[in-house]
UniProtKB/Swiss-Prot annotation:
Binds to DNA and alters its conformation. May be involved in regulation of gene expression, nucleoid organization and DNA protection. Gene3D superfamilies: Nucleoid-associated protein YbaB-like domain. It holds the Pfam family YbaB_DNA_bd. GO terms for cellular component: bacterial nucleoid; cytosol. This is Nucleoid-associated protein PC1_1077. It is found in: Cytoplasm, Nucleoid. One of its GO terms (molecular function) is DNA binding. It comes from the Bacteria. It comes from Pectobacterium carotovorum subsp. carotovorum (strain PC1). The lineage of its organism: Bacteria, Pseudomonadati, Pseudomonadota, Gammaproteobacteria, Enterobacterales. Belongs to the YbaB/EbfC family. Homodimer.
Amino acid sequence: MFGKGGIGNLMKQAQQMQEKMQQMQEEVANLEVTGESGAGLVKITINGAHNCRRVEIDPSLMEDDKEMLEDLIAAAFNDAARRIAETQKEKMAAVSSGMQLPPGFKMPF
């Protein structure tokens, strides 16, 4: 099934992938992404662990109704979370792109 040295090569690839994944997870944890809503009137910056680092609200929104502001804040946070998820998915794909996996083997992402 694996041929000569195939299992050894597969184990080596798995170890390399594990190291790359750990490095990628550290990179994503340190990454900061800003999500926006209301055409940039509300901005929320979160890190890769989804911890909020900064909230910016345009002063013009302070005069509007509270409910709209709350909706814009939630939308900005969701935008930032989506951007983190996309970045994480791209980095995971880059980690696994060079591996020669056995037929039918699928990565968990």
